[in-house]
Amino acid sequence: MKIPKFEAQTEWNIPTEFPDLRQVDEIAIDLETKDPDLIKKGSGSVIGNGDVIGIAVATNHYKGYFPIAHEGGGNMDKKRVLSWLKDVLEAPSTKVFHNAIYDVCWLRAMGFKINGDIACTMIAAAVTNENRFRYDLNSLSWHYLGCLLYTSDAADDSLR
C-alpha cells in the first residue's frame, strides 16, 4: 500500500507583518529547534545547549513561520520576533502545542511567561487512546488525516 504524502509548501515567504493575535481564542504554536544533545543529555532548554531556530504560529485566520536562527540565512530580526511572540504568549488565549512539555520548556527557558490554558495534542491523543504505540505528530496525522507530514523508509514501515 502506498502511503499518501502531505504536500507541504516547499517555498515559504517570510511574514511581512506581525499580526495582532492577542484577541483570538486559540493559537497553535510549534517551535523548530536545534537540539544537538537531546538524545544523550536531554533537552537543550534544560542543559543550556541548543537554540530555537524558528516559530510557527497558526490560528483560524492566520498562519506564519518566523525563522530566527536558521544556519542558511533568511532569518527575521530575532528581537522583533521575540517581542511580538511575548505579546502572543501573554494573551489569555489557549495555546495549542504538540509535545507541549518540550516547547513550553524552551519558551520558559527563554524567559517567556505563558498566559491562558495550554493544550497538548500529544497528551490529548494519549488520553483518547492509551493503547496507541506512537504519539508523534506524523503517526497521529496518518491516523486521523490519512496523510503523513514527512516520509522515510522507517516511517513507512512503522505505519504498515
Where are these regions (language model features)?
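Acidic Asp/Glu-based divalent-cation binding sites
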Residues: D103, D156-D157
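Conserved RNase H-like, two-metal-ion catalytic cores of nucleic-acid enzymes
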Residues: M1-H143
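Glycine-rich, acidic and aromatic/proline-enriched surface loops and short helix-turn segments
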Residues: G146-C147
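Conserved small/polar residues in nucleotide/adenosyl-binding loops
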Residues: Y150-A155
